[in-house]
From Swiss-Prot:
This is Chalcone synthase 1. Pathway: Secondary metabolite biosynthesis; flavonoid biosynthesis. The keyword Acyltransferase applies. Belongs to the thiolase-like superfamily. Chalcone/stilbene synthases family. Its EC number is 2.3.1.74.
């Protein structure tokens, strides 16, 4: 008779969880950041708020964003005037949009990831879906499973309302699933649409205005598994370790509340300071076991909550400007897509590394770090190992 120990050992994979494919997608509607203030104040019937518009223009100018993608078009907003008001009841209209569009956007990214992976959908064993855009039952994980479709026996996990750190969370979960289930192939999808957060401007809620200047729509899908099949599956990054922590004395720094008016965000000004003061502790805990203490020897993927966070992290750790190149590139071209951002950055990094002939998927370097920051303040830290490009 087989012992429990023998059975458990046979259930586990041998090698580390590995990213095997990445696919991304955005809505077709592209928004130019330089003209967005004029559009935003016009569509929300707020052109009389001239001083506030000037403030918003400065926010957009400082955002380091060139363009974003948004499902919400002028036509949709004209059909839903309450979404353009500052605090009008509008949750039903928002929900009607996102419960349909979030899985659809996720499907497009997933199809790209599956194509790169090169394996049949029937080999997907687990599905993890993450969004902060709307809530419904059956949830987005179920809707995506039906849209693709995948086998009815695929083991699903739905993550709602986690916010901007969750790109790290899904990698941590997928790592545990892949390493503890031999032969598992985990499809991870983060899909975010700003239809839940869009609203008109208000002088009394400037942190809401910050969100209007930063957030964009996007979905990213990743396939993760241990022990890649040689000659069939192509590894991109290995997930070596993953941790989550709460930043001390940071309660209330970032809050989000889903109410009749949609999802509202509230930010403390010192979010960049709180993150930059505490980030080195997470780095030391993650990299001391590997004997690494030179943060410039790593490749970097950091959630681009906004340029101030990136600037302060860079300054605090003495990072060379090129360390956050991929992160800033994604912020510039897509804005802050919440949980999907770090997965977009992974995709950008491996593509640029190959294009530039840098030797590894991590800009020619062996070890890297992925950071997610969000409500809590919560910090996710994932240690990555690159592979030959």
């Amino acid at each position: 008779m087989v012992t429990v120990e023998e059975y458990r050992k046979a259930q586990r994979a041998e090698g580390p969880a590995t990213i095997l494919a990445i696919g991304t997608s955005t809505p077709s509607n592209c928004v130019d950041q330089s003209t967005y203030p004029d559009y935003y104040f016009r569509i929300t019937n707020s052109e009389h708020k001239t001083e506030l518009k000037e403030k918003f223009k400065r926010m957009c100018d400082k955002s380091m964003i060139k363009k974003r993608y948004m499902h919400l078009t002028e036509e949709i907003l004209k059909e839903n005037p309450n979404m353009c008001a500052y605090m009008a009841p509008s949750l039903d209209a928002r929900q009607d949009i996102v419960v349909v569009e979030v899985p659809k956007l996720g499907k497009r990214g997933t199809q790209k990831a599956i194509k790169e992976w090169g394996q049949p959908k029937s080999k997907i064993t687990h599905l993890v879906f993450c969004t902060t855009s709307g809530v419904d039952m059956p949830a987005c994980d179920y809707q995506l499973a039906k849209l693709l479709p995948v086998r009815p026996s695929v083991k699903r996990l739905m993550m709602y309302q986690q916010g901007c750190f969750a790109g790290g969370t899904v990698l941590r979960l997928a790592k545990d699933l892949a390493e503890n289930n031999k032969g598992a192939r985990v499809l991870v999808v983060c899909s975010e649409i700003t239809a839940v957060t869009f609203r008109g401007p208000s002088e009394s809620h400037l942190d809401s205005l910050v969100g209007q200047a930063l957030f964009g729509d996007g979905a990213a899908a990743i396939i993760i598994g241990s022990d890649p099949i040689i000659g069939v599956e192509r590894p991109l990054f290995e997930l070596v370790s993953a941790a989550q922590t709460l930043v001390p004395d940071s309660e209330g720094a970032i809050d989000g509340h889903l109410r009749e008016v949609g999802l509202t965000f509230h930010l403390l000004k010192d979010v960049p300071g709180l993150i930059s003061k505490n980030i080195e502790k997470s780095l030391l805990e993650a990299f001391q076991p590997l004997g690494i203490s030179d943060w410039n020897s790593l490749f970097w993927i950091a959630h681009p909550g906004g340029p101030a966070i990136l600037d302060q992290v860079e300054l605090k750790l003495g990072l060379k400007p090129e360390k956050l190149r991929a992160t800033r590139e994604v912020l510039s071209n897509y804005g802050n897509m919440s949980s999907a951002c770090v997965l977009f950055i992974l995709d950008e990094m491996r593509k640029a590394s190959t294009k530039e002939g840098l030797g590894t998927t991590g800009e020619g370097l062996e070890w890297g770090v992925l950071f997610g920051f969000g409500p809590g303040l919560t910090v996710e830290t994932v240690v990555l190992h690159s592979v030959a490009a």
